[in-house]
Amino acid sequence: MADKVQTTLLFLAVGEFSVGILGNAFIGLVNCMDWVKKRKIASIDLILTSLAISRICLLCVILLDCFILVLYPDVYATGKEMRIIDFFWTLTNHLSIWFATCLSIYYFFRIANFFHPLFLWMKWRIDRVISWILLGCVVLSVFISLPATENLNADFRFCVKAKRKTNLTWSCRVNKTQHASTKLFLNLATLLPFCVCLMSFFLLILSLRRHIRRMQLSATGCRDPSTEAHVRALKAVISFLLLFIAYYLSFLVATSSYFMPETELAVIFGESIALIYPSSHSFILILGNNKLRHASLKVIWKVMSILKGRKFQQHKQIGRETMLF
């Protein structure tokens, strides 16, 4: 029964992976083509491209981990190459979260309207320093990933190996104090960008409220470009927050799985849920970006035209064959 559930979850993971690769590859391809065409890249496009690349890598690592867990369980328990996979999973996980946080921060500084000198100073310089901020996210993610991977995943592999040898649920003896401290370190590391996004969300709401109040006092109405920009930014940030919460819970299931009776099943279940975040959020970003949305509509229109053309050719061929008979 457990094997059937694992196989079903694996097929689900493959479907989520395909959707995620399609959306993130589209974002990266459109922005790179625009970069080559204009020979420069806007800050928002740089953030979206970096986020798309990190999520493509994250999707590949998670799916590879699922395949090894289901198809090669011995390698999963004892293989030294799993340390490499664990490192890249932790790295791409933090890169994806921090790049999404940078996107929320960028929306906040570009759209929000405050008159504090510090805010105005940062607002004027956000485009100049965004590349350095992204580079800092890479360095910080590497710094977090190295010690966390070495401590947390060594205990996990030992537990899987012990359970396979003894076939007992609670026979795994791990250093729970070390596991708890490492897990706390990982959770705090992901909690910081979440708090930053949450702060950006509430400040955007405050900025929108002030803007609407000013528009009402001036009797010019509430629906203007600035209001619509606020609403689009809020939708993007809140979608990230909700998906991140689901991803965070699935991450907790995966990292805590060796305290559960069915370790492997808990891991692949957590990973299949975790794939929803990098897969679905890319399409939300496409719909919220004018350039990406227009490019996607062009692609859909071309695909529909090709399909209609093929269907017309098939009907035409059938008509010719009917006339011959």
Swiss-Prot record:
Keywords: G-protein coupled receptor, Glycoprotein, Membrane, Receptor, Sensory transduction, Taste, Transducer, Transmembrane, Transmembrane helix. It is found in: Membrane. InterPro entries: GPCR_Rhodpsn_7TM (IPR017452), TAS2R (IPR007960). Residues 31-55, 116-128, 209-235, 288-319 are cytoplasmic. SUPFAM superfamilies: Family A G protein-coupled receptor-like. The keyword Chloroplast does not apply. Glycans are attached at residues 167, 175. The keyword Transmembrane applies. It is a multi-pass membrane protein. Residues 1-9, 77-94, 150-187, 257-266 are extracellular. PROSITE patterns: G_PROTEIN_RECEP_F1_2. Signal peptide: none annotated. One of its GO terms (cellular component) is plasma membrane. Several bitter taste receptors are expressed in a single taste receptor cell. Belongs to the G-protein coupled receptor T2R family. Gustducin-coupled receptor implicated in the perception of bitter compounds in the oral cavity and the gastrointestinal tract. Signals through PLCB2 and the calcium-regulated cation channel TRPM5. This is Taste receptor type 2 member 7. It comes from Pan paniscus.
